[in-house]
């Protein structure tokens, strides 16, 4: 990864992996000078089905303990949904009951794992808590745990024409509001589709409208070692192309690019 100009990685195995494999990956990252940006939980700790919910809570606690053990910047998940699809859009996702369950689940995960070297974070989503930066501030206050922080995915918050076309102003205000809490970032792009009605598509970096140079500068201002993780591409070749593109684009703009 260092040869590609990268300075951060996502941890490739979960807490159920053999201890020697976990230690080997963590040791390799440390030897190469790579920041372990995040350990993903990616499950639904507020699932309506009790069996799924219990399994998800167990996984979140295990993943947070793993992140703490290996010194990752954070363990990241989404809040979870009220329906059968773990990351799905449902009306009830905006209910007070769902808010209360989200706060309770985050507290229980952090209290059970008791991290001291890392943070539990929620990746924002367009259709669940936290749906906007103001709600993320409310969530931080409601959870009231020192080891709860922010995972920044700016593209997921571009949900209107105003935010889309004024993305530079939007991202600056978001970093001003949440910057001190941010532990890791996803970097990608967003493109408005021509078809009616209003449709936004997540794209690879450079295929949308976001000012990625400004995004990287704002992240760097918060933390010069802030991980910026590319995601949701379909092959190794696509990732290599995206890394090369982003590195060239940011270097041309005079923006540090080591992640």
Predicted regions and their residues:
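Conserved, mostly hydrophobic/aromatic
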Residues: 1, 29, 56, 67, ...
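Acidic (Asp/Glu)-rich catalytic clusters
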Residues: 1-3, 18-39, 62-71, 107-115, ...
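Acidic/histidine-rich catalytic cores of soluble enzymes
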Residues: 9, 39, 104-204, 209, ...
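Acidic-and-aromatic substrate-binding clefts and catalytic sites of carbohydrate-active enzymes
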Residues: 10-24, 44-54, 83, 126-132, ...
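Active-site acidic/histidine proton-transfer and metal-coordination neighborhood
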Residues: 27, 31, 50-150
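Short acidic/histidine-rich active-site segments
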Residues: 187, 224-233
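C-terminal helical cap(s) of enzyme catalytic domains, especially alpha/beta-barrels
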Residues: 239-257
